[in-house]
Regions:
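Short, cationic interaction patches enriched in Lys/Arg with P/S/T/G and frequent prolines
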Residues: 2, 16-119, 124-128
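Bacterial N-terminal signal peptides
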Residues: 7-17
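Surface-exposed, glycine-biased beta-strand/turn segments
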Residues: 103-212
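Acidic, glycine-rich catalytic/binding loops that coordinate metals and/or anionic ligands
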Residues: 145-164, 170, 174, 185, ...
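Active-site region of chymotrypsin-like
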Residues: 176, 213-240
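Active-site loop architecture of trypsin-fold serine endopeptidases
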Residues: 204-212, 253-265
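Short hydrophobic beta/alpha edge segments that flank linear recognition/processing sites
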Residues: 215-216, 244-257
Length: 298
């Protein structure tokens, strides 16, 4: 027998201080689930942290090449996007001249560079140092050329359930200016701007291990990046390194990762100097807010 399940999610378009905030999950006698910031008898604490986890340490690598004259440090960028890197040498010993300042560089996509060559002050003794590498996706020298974005979906109309500086989850530098739009699972998600697909995740089921769920990250020509999160498993139709046009189908919306209901989490980010942060943007068409939305299914 089919059973209708209704989920009511209270996600007001909140602004104000940027801090984490306690949400209460309450199920009534009819099985209706409500998320609210008001404590109720029988409610459970539900802390929602919608953060994005992208692991790029396997794509940005520091290689040490030893030779008769000393050692050369070679940096590899296997990503389809530039990466800003900073290399510090700590606990230095027996290095001719020493390396007093950190070395900062922007590696082009899919490239490698000989960053430093170190020679020993005493050729009979080994070099001593500890390499500390810091890096961030993107080129901080590029500046955004627009803050107006076409709607990244087909169909609708759909409603905004959480906006910039939202207390439920939009309080970190990476997600402060993100927008959440409630929509049925399976809604076509399209590229808001043309660019190159940098990273995708397509195999996560439910909450999984990544709070972002399934996602697509696209690098735009001005150095900004559009990121589409909580996508339906198996629906991502683009590949890393692929060039896409504005309006190209990317995937279908879902409810994967740290998601309280079916929606698209869309954010625009850029490298602000060894850190990726979200930046303000607007859709070029009005999207009304909806404090409460309900979805039903069988």
């Amino acid at each position: 027998m089919c059973k209708n399940i209704f989920l009511t999610v209270f996600l007001a378009l909140l602004t104000g201080q940027s801090y984490a905030f306690t949400v209460y999950k309450y199920t009534d006698e009819n099985g209706v689930v409500t998320y609210t910031d008001k404590a109720k008898a029988g409610a459970q604490v539900f802390v929602f942290n919608d953060r994005m986890v992208e692991r790029i340490e396997n794509d940005v690598k520091l290689e040490t090449r030893k030779h008769a004259a000393g050692e050369t440090l070679v940096l590899h960028n296997q990503l389809y996007a530039p990466v800003e890197v900073q290399l510090r040498l700590e606990n230095q010993g027996n290095i001719a001249g020493g390396v007093k300042q950190p070395v900062t560089w922007v590696l082009p996509p899919r490239s490698e560079i000989r960053l430093l060559t170190l020679a020993p002050a005493d050729p009979q003794q080994p070099l001593q140092y500890k390499a500390k590498l810091t890096y961030a996706l993107g080129d901080p020298r590029l500046l955004p050329t627009t803050d107006q974005y076409p709607l990244p979906w087909r169909g609708g109309p759909f409603r905004l359930t959480q906006g910039a500086n939202g207390k439920y989850s939009h309080f970190t530098p990476k997600g402060r200016y993100a927008l959440d739009i409630a929509m049925p699972e399976g809604t076509p998600i399209i590229a808001a701007r043309a660019g190159v697909v940098v990273k995708i995740e397509n195999q996560q089921t439910g909450r999984g291990t990544n709070p972002a769920g399934n996602f697509v990250r696209i690098l735009h020509d001005d150095g900004t990046m559009g990121v589409y999160l909580h996508l339906q498993r198996g629906s991502v139709s683009v590949t890393e390194g692929q060039r896409v046009d504005q309006g190209s189908l990317l995937a279908r919306s879902g409810n994967t990762g740290n998601s309280t209901g079916p929606h698209l989490h869309f954010v625009v980010q850029r490298n602000v100097g060894l850190a990726v942060e979200s930046i303000p943007f607007d859709f070029n068409r009005p999207v009304n807010s909806l404090p409460n939305f309900a979805v039903g299914g069988e």
